[in-house]
From Swiss-Prot:
Its main location: cytoplasm. This is Probable dual-specificity RNA methyltransferase RlmN. S-adenosyl-L-methionine binds at G177, E178, S209, S232, L233, H234, N308. The gene is rlmN. The lineage of its organism: Bacteria, Bacillati, Bacillota, Bacilli, Bacillales. Belongs to the radical SAM superfamily. RlmN family. Its EC number is 2.1.1.192. Disulfide bonds join C120-C351. One of its GO terms (molecular function) is 4 iron, 4 sulfur cluster binding. It comes from Staphylococcus epidermidis (strain ATCC 12228 / FDA PCI 1200). Specifically methylates position 2 of adenine 2503 in 23S rRNA and position 2 of adenine 37 in tRNAs. Confers resistance to some classes of antibiotics.
Amino acid sequence: MITAEKKKRNKFLPNFEKQSIYSLRYDEMQQWLIDHGQQKFRAKQIFEWLYQKRVNTIDEMTNLSKELRQILKDHFAMTTLTTVVKQESKDGTIKFLFELQDGYTIETVLMRHEYGNSVCVTTQVGCRIGCTFCASTLGGLKRNLEAGEIVSQVLTVQKALDETNERVSQIVIMGIGEPFENYDEMMDFLRIVNDDNSLNIGARHITVSTSGIIPRIYDFAEEDIQINFAVSLHGAKDEIRSRLMPINRAYNVDKLMEAIRYYQEKTNRRVTFEYGLFGGVNDQLEHARDLAHLIKNLNCHVNLIPVNHVPERNYVKTPKDDIFKFEKELKRLGINATIRREQGSDIDAACGQLRAKERQVETR
């Protein structure tokens, strides 16, 4: 729930007349009902309508009194996302371009795996981190999303899956934006979708990825929630990482590793390092050795990512043979590593590509 205190801390939050009903955690809904002279148990009924029956309007909550429905309508909006573009890949990946109530657009991706359906969600409209390989940063940061707008991405995809009796089984917070720059709303989102009364998606089936916002890594280490944690690394030495990720100039590799060690000491949980391979930049065997040396004493996994080409950027794909050699070298040096399966390469599935393409159309 967006409070005055949260708005003070997060200047990029929207200032809507009514906040999304999906932005309330279960405990917040209970307290809100008490504060408005209603019975606490109604929270369970409301959440059932929102997350199990997945209704589109408050008026459909027929076991609530008309009075309570009106109070809810007076205070909250039922966040709806308008599908602007829906692209489906040959491999079953579906990419959605959603329009928000203020006209901004965001991307959400449904990825199908043998082990279930995974949804990649967006946390910001645009991004200001400035990674030089990413299309998400091209227009800068416009605003942060409410927790309810992040929840609505999962719900909208789930409603599409309802037609084939499928369910969202995993969530990755790796879409547009830096989740740790919208920390409070991201944490509310995590607690909402993980709640038994909501979508009940297990914490170990949810992964959040950061570019390395170090103060928030320390905060995340203190959270009492077993969410999987990934770090976009892409370079084991400052020179290369700063070229790819300007955030490294503020939070360099040594400081990042120190924060990650603290996280592991507090949580005893494995960290995944995302390592995109860029032809001629960070994909040689010497780079694999540098990476292995950097992380050798950590409980970690390396996810090697064959990069998707972004027309606005000049990076090229690493040849497949070189990718396999890189993986083999890491394993030889005792590092757990896998190559991410490419999905949606035929449908603008790289982060920010579809939104960037639509923005070009809009501005012509």
